[in-house]
Amino acid sequence: MSKVRVCFLGTPEFAVTSLKALLSDEHFEVVGVVTQPDRPAGRKLQLTPSPVKALAQAHNLKVLAPESLKANPLMLQEIKTWGAEVAVVVAFGQILTQEFLDSFRFGCVNVHGSVLPRWRGAAPIQRAIEAGDVESGVTLQKMVKKLDAGDIIGIRRVKITPDMNALQLHDVLAQLGAELLQVELMDYVRGNLAPTPQDESKVTLAKKIEKMESQIDWSTSAKAIDGKIRGFVYGPGTYTFLQGKKLKLHRATVTRDGGSIGSAKPGTITAVHEDHISVATGDGVLQLFEVQPESRNRMAIADFLKGHALKVGDQLGV
């Protein structure tokens, strides 16, 4: 059987793993790549290609990087000249038109970072961690116009451990997504696998994370705050205030042994230890292990305490 000709659409590191898998697989030929335009990055804000573009250029692939593929019909015509039989979309970051979806013999397939229909939308990895899910995974779906609503070609699942953060889950899912492409995509193209419809009664939405969500509300539960800290490390992060200055939170854990809580107001420090501080919440106690003061690097609480004389009764969030 001849190689399956693939048009690949993707942008961040999550997509790089999938592109590498296709490039190394003798059953596929990547005939071209579509990605987001170069963006300013680093302290000097130099225009920098997306991770997918950098990999594509290293392999001398054709690359297009439109601001909006939807608004550029001539670019779609150019893509059609590549002769791709299927489009593989992994974290591309743009809405695709029905005309684009209909432009390939085997249609367009998408690697999505959740077990659909749970967590359709822009932030499935972060929302799974934030919600306290005990399982996640990746789905290979046949793309339709409605967001993340296509028939399912294949799924890979993984357990979420209590201390796993979104960056760690991201890396696991990226690898599982690549495995899905190398196995289920080939079965689908050969006609050996029939996609199955999603159960619309089980849909949950993973809305984009807004900056306003990053501030910790200490009146919520310790479990909810811990989930947000671990979930938002892949994205805007989380923060609170200490003595009027912003304090980013990087690593925490829920505990029952948090000092004398009594009727402590949420956000109150209930215990100060060498390697962590305990903070009262609306339900339970949260131990903080790593933080980042304004204009400083991330640091362990032990180092933070050397320059900040915290005591029981001090208040976070003000």
Swiss-Prot record:
- Write out the entry's keywords from A to Z: Protein biosynthesis, Transferase
Annotated (6S)-5,6,7,8-tetrahydrofolate binding lies at 114-117
**PROSITE patterns reported for this sequence:** GART
InterPro entries for this protein: Fmt, Formyl_trans_C, Formyl_transf_N, Formyl_transf_N_sf, Formyl_transferase-like_C_sf, GART_AS, Met-tRNA-FMT_C, Met-tRNA-FMT_N
Give EC number(s), comma-separated. Answer: 2.1.2.9
- Pfam families xref list: Formyl_trans_C, Formyl_trans_N
One GO cellular component, as annotated: cytosol
SUPFAM superfamilies for this protein: FMT C-terminal domain-like (SSF50486), Formyltransferase (SSF53328)
Q: Cite a single GO MF annotation.
A: methionyl-tRNA formyltransferase activity
Q: Which reaction does it catalyse?
A: L-methionyl-tRNA(fMet) + (6R)-10-formyltetrahydrofolate = N-formyl-L-methionyl-tRNA(fMet) + (6S)-5,6,7,8-tetrahydrofolate + H(+)
Report the family membership.
Answer: Belongs to the Fmt family.
HAMAP family per record: Formyl_trans (MF_00182)
Q: Which NCBIfam families match?
A: fmt (TIGR00460)
PANTHER family, per database record: METHIONYL-TRNA FORMYLTRANSFERASE, METHIONYL-TRNA FORMYLTRANSFERASE, MITOCHONDRIAL
Q: What does this protein do?
A: Attaches a formyl group to the free amino group of methionyl-tRNA(fMet). The formyl group appears to play a dual role in the initiator identity of N-formylmethionyl-tRNA by promoting its recognition by IF2 and preventing the misappropriation of this tRNA by the elongation apparatus.
Q: Please give the name of this protein.
A: Methionyl-tRNA formyltransferase
